[in-house]
């Protein structure tokens, strides 16, 4: 930019708010965030300052930092400060203050105070002009809020910041920008993104950032990064540095923010980093830098942010692709934080990818001990790379770290890697440095890698070498220098004589570590020599040395190579002993060596087998012959320790040799099996060795050898490396046989001392790498329990298990599992109960000491195989009340409530009761579980009796002790229920007897009533139900209380369980009562149903139908369905009486849905029995104590409440019952949401199905006969005996609805006799017949259709019903009956005629003609009763509709009488007249459709009839009139329409609506007519048109009969009709007619009106002519020849004032304008026509009315435009000058003004064509400019002159001058 442009821009910015005029100042001042511009422009600064200050004060309350602006931007001195006159320094400071304020206020833009404060800055300092960019930056996060739109609005468009130009479009639209537009601007303009990013960093520096701003930046940055995924090069160059700078700033934001905002800032940075790392490849340095920055924040590892920190680090490092996994950026991330609160575990479970992060972290933090906390969470299984990295790092520190704690962690890690992938682990070892194998690693770590869960990890078993090999190897190592090793061994010399004692643990560990340390650096071959030297140098004797070596070989933690080396060493030493002169026997080692055969490693087992062979060889050498040799026993003291000699079960040498011979044969040793499979050792010992025999000693193996071996194995001081193998061997044997007495060898030693030694054993196991839980504790527990006859020892075992269950450790779990497996082996019931009670006590104490309880007692209890006796014993132990100390002697079994409450008031007793309640709950849970398993025969009467006692006790505790017994009650009820069900199932094989004093139904009923829990109540009801089936005699005496409770409570519950319990109870109690032969069964059922129905409103709505349906089916519909209907009817009656409409509807809906669940026969039988009950209700009040009264009052369904009603009350009640059942039957067929078929459909399916048995149909019809007979007899009673009209109406309705259920043919057959007039003899029969006829009509209407009309239906209706109806119509017995017959007749004919062609057959046609004769006689159409006439017309209509032209013979009997009848209705407005008119019109419509040709003669009368039937709706009449147009000859229709208007004076009708209908049908007729017909009737139509045009005058003469609006509407219709007709004519036919019309308009020729009608004629004509002009346009222009002279004359008369009619003048001018406009043939340019119209037209200017002057201007300008020529223009100019010249004295100001406006319009239209006449007009224009009338002057100056100047292109002043 040039320096000049820079200077100009600077000047422009400084002066942008400078305004030089008032308008500009007002515009600048009107920019406001709060006020409308008009209001804002008038406000002063004092007022604005007060608003701004008020806002600032409110902001100060929110943030005190705003207070500093009180002295600057909001100082009172700023009211008079004008920034446009300030120095540059002042402006710089002002801008700085504004920017700081805007930055600070930006979070509060949505608050009113901030708007007020910013309003002051905008209005006073014009920050919208000078600080617009900052204003937009601070408000941009609120882009979608109204305040941002306001800010856009106040920034002037010409001052809009260039970088924000993208938002100008939204400013113009006053709309918020979209999020996509903002993203687009960031994407397209890197400078804009950089600007906002720097602004955000400034906000962070100023501690003014806020949540919305962070969200805004994050959302856009994330989308921005995503948008550049295909153009990362550009992104990396332009945007990435900016984003990285912002992220760095966010991560180092500092701690001055609130904790919430600090978290928001941190999460914003994390989110951006996450997106960047996933979409943009980040360098390793950047990843490390991000990590350091993230962890540099001290809050990054806080509890509320730690998770997010690890997630983002995980995602960041997941894309790290460098080989170097050792980094130093995690120093601020301690491992303890990562594992705290299971963070890593939860993240891994949630699927977050953090594995690579953990690998890098672990590799970077080794060998720190904390790093191993992370190792367990690293998954190396799926990544070979990770596996190699981790393994290599661990190997490095295994060889380069001496810390013992690190070594232990390394061992755990290596074992984990081995479990994960053994093959890969071995491969990594082989590739590490010079190559390693697992044995070398074990030597380095001095431990065995792996456990029992890992298969043999060595590539091949290491076999013991022979002596020859040893000699070669010894020779090979002679050159190795062992001097240093030998010298150092002297320091470890020990005096310990035996290492087979656990007291030597410490010494053993110390010596082995010394050996391991010394031999670690040597190879295996060298280690052999070192071991020999070690043995000689350290131990005091060979025995001590061998004991040490044996222990080493048994210790799993010792590397395998060392163990094998030691076994080889032992083998050599034992061989040396065999060659010794001291004759030493080594067979005492056999039991120990046998244990070696149970090792997990095959090579070790093979080593021990070799040792046994050596021992066998030695023993055989000394004792192989029969000669006795005296020998010493090797290692006796080391093996037996301090054990008394008498307790050492040592076998003689010969027996020892025999034992070894059994184990090791010459050819094949059975020990070979154990070498292959260690589990074979049990077989070798217990099936071979211990069962071996020796001559003379049958129990040699069973007694002697077993005692010898087990005596050693039970030695308590042996180290765990020996004992755990012993325990496992004996445990397996004990469990495999269901119990073995060999286990008792250990009961007084190992088992008894186990609890005290357990902690030491754990430490020993850990040191030796023995799995304590599986290999020690499981084996120990396995020694306990099993079948045995030794009750003393069994009791000891039970006590041991009890003690184990109390142990505060995992021993509980093992003991619990063991107890569940050996529980049945305890034969003592008391012992079983003791064990169960112990588990219960543990469960009770769980809450008090839950930390020490590891086992789940509930699980153990459920695993126990309980029997009946044990359950009874446990139950007796928890009878609660018997445990409560009584204060006094109880004399009754049932304790008084008062005494119990007193006892329970004591705290100690209450505590005891609560504890025992817990016990009871557990026992009941246990009992329920076992009952549900059905694994044993637990359920017996004594169990039930105990449960009943507990039920009573619970009632006491719940009601008197206020203890929470609900759960216990519910469980108890379940137990009782299950036990009864099981006893019932077993009742076929067992007969049960119950103690009636204990097992009592009243106890259950009492508990039900006392309980507040619906669940308990329901379960106890089920108990009653099942008990009723098992022992009905128990519940017989408690039936009524049970039913009462169910009706009052259970039915109200809204759950499936309650519903099920209710149904099951009834289903089993009622049959039990019936089976018991109860005579009162029906009364009990009535009582039950009464209870249930009484609670109907409280039963959940959606359960009612299912409940009562189930109830009915359970009780049998024969016993219950009618009772439910009767009781529901009572409920309905009560609700109707109390005006409870909603409840009444609810009852009807329920009953209808309820009945649908039963078959047709069941429903009908229920209805019949309902009527029987209804009939039992007396018609009058009964005498109290009478037999009938007593009989009814004893029944719950009647009761005193009904019998106490008065006579009227009883009759009302009976009436309402009838109304109820009637509505139920009526609603049966209505649509509902049920999928079940209605009763009507069910009946039809039976009666109409030919496959149904005849018996079923007969039974069904029999029900109809019974009910019908009953209703008819009731009708007779309430008609002749005790008349009651309400009851009669209900009975009639009921009879109709009931019979309506029958299929149509059955229905007709059932009513045909009642309709026969020959059998009607009294009023009752007439009424019945009438109701049947109405019902028949309705049924035929609803049910008859083309699909269901068959021969049966046809015969029933046409052959049976129709003749009966004809006979009844002809006889005319009663008006209502006659009407019903006629209506039924109409329905039949309409249905059959519309659905089939059966009625047009010859026979049926004759029958209909005969019927028509009857109906048109005095019995029908000619009757004096309007009702009968209406019905007759309907019947005639139906017949005509069917027969059509075949009915023409009776035309004279139909149409003329009908029209005559219509005439009688015109003078009356009653309802019958309306109905008559409507029916007659419908009859005419039918005739017009069916026989239109024959209706032509009566067309005038038909039109008059239809058009003047005011009582009939217009839409009906309009549709009938449309039928006439559609079906009749249109020329006749038009002729008739014109005739009734012209000749019959229809226009005189007083109803404008009728005239409208007339014109509508005329319009339709014209539109449908063809041109030929229209031309033929044109003369007649023109006569009509002329007469129609005179309608206005007629209305005026009739004292303004219609208002102007009505007349205008009618005239508009006249014109539409006329115009439409003209469009049907050609020019030849229309011209003469038009000429006639003109003559009528001008001279009145052919007018029928009287008086002076000239103006009305002209007005009507020109309105019509204008409409024609709009339609025909130029076609009709030439027709003006007929009008030129009349128009000129009329115009002159207007100019002279002879005629004054504004409307006519306007229409005339518009007509001329249209003619000029549509003139395409220079019609008006013809000289004579121009001369004829020019002057008259211009003369209108002389006196034109102001309100129509514009029409004249338009007319004149159109005329001039049309006739434009020099000759005509000259004449027109001078003609116009005449009306503006002052020389014409008659010219008025009004004339001048309209002439000036005319000239202005002419110049606008003609343009330069009229400039040539300007010199002529200039003098007159100048004259007008000086006119005395100011209005004239202004019109010229502002109108004409400006137009001329626009055309001229220069000012007119010089011409005027």
Curated annotation (Swiss-Prot):
Keyword terms, alphabetized: Membrane, Nucleus, Repeat, Ribonucleoprotein, Ribosome biogenesis, rRNA processing, Transmembrane, Transmembrane helix
Annotated compartments: Nucleus, Nucleolus; Membrane
Keyword Cell inner membrane listed: no
Bilayer topology: Single-pass membrane protein
Top-level taxon in the UniProt lineage: Eukaryota
GO biological process per UniProt: endonucleolytic cleavage in 5'-ETS of tricistronic rRNA transcript (SSU-rRNA, 5.8S rRNA, LSU-rRNA); endonucleolytic cleavage in ITS1 to separate SSU-rRNA from 5.8S rRNA and LSU-rRNA from tricistronic rRNA transcript (SSU-rRNA, 5.8S rRNA, LSU-rRNA); endonucleolytic cleavage to generate mature 5'-end of SSU-rRNA from (SSU-rRNA, 5.8S rRNA, LSU-rRNA); positive regulation of transcription by RNA polymerase I
Membrane-spanning segments: 267-287
CC per GO annotation: 90S preribosome; membrane; preribosome, small subunit precursor; rDNA heterochromatin; small-subunit processome; t-UTP complex
Nucleus keyword on record: yes
GO MF assignments: U3 snoRNA binding
UniProt HEAT repeat ranges: 1817-1855
Main function: Involved in nucleolar processing of pre-18S ribosomal RNA. Involved in ribosome biosynthesis.
Entry's family note: Belongs to the HEATR1/UTP10 family.
Subunit details: Component of the ribosomal small subunit (SSU) processome.
Name of the protein in question: U3 small nucleolar RNA-associated protein 10
Organism: Debaryomyces hansenii (strain ATCC 36239 / CBS 767 / BCRC 21394 / JCM 1990 / NBRC 0083 / IGC 2968) (Yeast)
Upper classification of the organism: Eukaryota, Fungi, Dikarya, Ascomycota, Saccharomycotina
Name of the gene: UTP10
